[in-house]
Amino acid sequence: MTGGTLNFITFNQDYSCLAVGTSKGFRFYHTDPFSKIFSSDEGNVSIIEMLFSTSLVALILTPRQLEIQNTKRASVICELTFPSAVLAVRLNRKRLAVVLECQIYLYDVSNMNLVQTIDTSPNPNAICALSPSSDSCYLVYPRPNPREDVGAKAPAHLPPPSQYVPPKRGDVLVYDALNLKTVNVVEAHKSPLCAIALNHDGSMLATASETGTIIRVFSLPQGQKLFQFRRGTVPTSIYSMSFNLSSTLLCVSSTSDTVHIFRLLNTQKNANALPGGGPAQGTRSRSFDVNDPSPHKGEVPSAGNGNNGSGSHKREPSGSFGNMLRRSSQMMVRGVAGVASSYLPQSVAEMWEPERDFAFIKIPKSSNNRAGGLSATPLRSVVAMSSSSPQVMVVTSDGGFYVYNIDMEKGGEGYLVKQFSVLDGDDKLTNSDYGA
């Protein structure tokens, strides 16, 4: 497969693979080391979803039709047609969730039988997450907002109106996808949601609202707030949120060219709220649609040209004067906030207390500018953390794949160590255990 327009990029559930959908087929890559492991020339793929590193893949080739393929056998397992366009697909070993604008269809993966149809508020940005865990198999999405004029009759020539209207608040409904029941509603934000993510075992939920300034993390299924972070003060749209495999870090990308990494410390304040048992394992939001119509509240320069090889864009290292000054100012603000918040009610104190990022990275600017030297559209990005090293992986809507090192002791700015392109013309495949 060569060329084609990039439509969609997503990590698999444990970030070991990357799936790329284009106008001329799709590809799978290993993320570490970066290498292509599968390629197909079939169709115009607008959405793609892998099932871990198995040969099972879900594809959207036309807006209303989903196709489940076994890539190892080159066979189609089933085809499903829906009443409106498919906006997102979520998959684990037991459940398949297909997200439409006003409905979610839930299937049993073992036989592909429909087990539940869930009506939702209008959800054009497909805000939804499914835990990769087969045990705590939670599906989370914006809480439906019922219509107030339920008794009003629509004109006979019009279709009946939806029973729900767009949400006015950022409440998250937690649904048990195995037992098919609602288990909780998390009141996460006062304004509507922009992004949500679950960790691997379904014990943590990360949320961001449309303003994009505050990130919150809750326990599941209890819904108790564990952490609250400030991403920044300028409103922005959150593109991607991702837990690392030990659920000790949370990565967030947005319309800003900065990726923030927040540390999930088990402080005394949060000790009683943390889920019981061992450390959780991580997942996402881990994909983006290049043609996503969601509004952008800021403009982001495009990322690098994505040539294969190691990056040379070492920015300010963690021990630099700039980072020392940045950390010193944050410590001063936290000190003042700590004193002030001790005299304030909890609801007011929370405005002072949100932690800032532990580390951050800057996405490189692209040399592939449009006419006039400016990008035609803001660059979208999705982030994940390596399971084998302290590295952050960033993939961008211009096909760039970037790997950054993070200092796990000092934090600060990470530096670029590798960069590749998922749109190059090299069709050589590497040997791997993909699909085994």
Swiss-Prot record:
Residues 286-299 have a biased composition (Basic and acidic residues). The keyword Repeat applies. Transmembrane segments: none annotated. GO terms for biological process: autophagy of mitochondrion; glycophagy; nucleophagy; pexophagy; protein localization to phagophore assembly site; protein transport. A motif (L/FRRG motif) lies at residues 229-233. The PI(3,5)P2 regulatory complex regulates both the synthesis and turnover of phosphatidylinositol 3,5-bisphosphate (PtdIns(3,5)P2). Necessary for proper vacuole morphology. Plays an important role in osmotically-induced vacuole fragmentation. Required for cytoplasm to vacuole transport (Cvt) vesicle formation, pexophagy and starvation-induced autophagy. Involved in correct apg-7/atg9 trafficking to the pre-autophagosomal structure. Might also be involved in premeiotic DNA replication. This is Autophagy-related protein 18. It comes from Neurospora crassa (strain ATCC 24698 / 74-OR23-1A / CBS 708.71 / DSM 1257 / FGSC 987). The lineage of its organism: Eukaryota, Fungi, Dikarya, Ascomycota, Pezizomycotina. The gene is apg-10.
